[in-house]
Amino acid sequence: MPTLLYLHGFNSSPESKKALQTEQWFANYAPDIEFVCPQLPPFANQAMALLSRLIEQRLPDPVYLVGSSMGGFLATCLVERYGLKAVLINPAVSPHRGLEDWLGENANYQTGETWRFEPEHIDEYKQWDPTAIK
């Protein structure tokens, strides 16, 4: 079964308006495609590990990506790694350049989950920054 993997933005959730609207559209018009929207951690290495597991569980069946904002950045990294197809919605580009404002204690505005962002987490995003898109 084909899968659409929706990647929400930084500090967002599967309950975001775009994620819910996309899920509803697929339920109505493409019920033969599995819609998956995981809660992504705000840390690049953890997010990429989670997404890689989800993709590898589904291959060789088709996996398609939709990424919004930071999810677009992650989708770009996954396209590079797995050769998948993706739709990017206002993707973050070189996001490590703008994450300093998140240093310290934070809370997800939808789930209320608290988390701490450290300088090494910015470095993770820098390490994942793709240098070439095939």
Residue ranges, per PLM feature:
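Short, glycine/serine-rich, charged loops/turns that create anion-binding
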Residues: N11, M70, V93
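Gly/Ala-rich beta-loop-alpha elbow adjacent to hydrolase catalytic centers
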Residues: L65-A75
